[in-house]
Amino acid sequence: KSTISLNRDDIYDDSWAVIIGIDKYKYSDQLKYAVKDAKAVKDMLINKFDYSEENIRYLTDEEATLSEIKLALDDISTSADESDRILVFYSGHGETQKNNDGTETGYIIPIDGRQDKPYATGLAMDEILRTCQMSNAKHMLFLMDACYSGLMTENVKGLSKPQEEGYLSKVANENARQIITAGGGGEMVIERDEWQHSAFTKNLLAGLDN
């Protein structure tokens, strides 16, 4: 069995999180288990890993507008100190836009966003990272349960295999910003009724529960 650890063990003074889950999109295909994914991650952080509920910004469906997501990220980023850590979990639609220079930009799509207009209505991962880079936090981990490419920047390590043994334990001690995504551009997030979760979050929760 793979083992994932989020225990503080004197590594961090405090823990902060932004957790977002969107099912009921206004202009995109609706999802079934993104909100359930978000709630399960939130509950596990609180009940097993001693995250304080007041240190978690939790946005689902109609709460997860573009402005509210940006405010939550800014609030957490400016609240965390240099001995703290930040976890950002997003479950919902992602989109990739190809740029004129051949690069790609990954976006998360808020409740009222449009996948065919990601630049105008979505939130670019670059912007999320810029906001969080203003933070003094020792460690930031982005768990993105969405499929898109164009996520990685020079100062961010990408990890794409949540089933990899001990992957969260391995990165927890590093002073770094890291991203784990459900898949690359053009792939689909897998949800199944038998799981009541996406494949990404199912594997994540199983690892955290060990």
Segments and roles (model prediction):
Residues 56-66:
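Short beta->alpha junction loops
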Residues 40-55:
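Signal peptide-proximal N-terminal region
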Residues 4, 14, 66-91, 95-157, ...:
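Caspase-like (clan CD) cysteine peptidase catalytic core
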Residues 25-39, 43, 191-195:
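Glycine- and acidic-residue-enriched helix-capping/strand-helix junction motifs
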Residues 15-29:
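Short glycine-rich His-centered loop
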Residues 21, 45, 60, 137-210:
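Active-site-proximal C-terminal subdomain of hydrolase catalytic domains
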Residues 1-8, 165:
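A short, compositionally biased domain-edge/stem linker segment
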Residues 15, 56, 177:
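Short, conserved active-site loop motifs that form the nucleotide-linked donor/cofactor pocket
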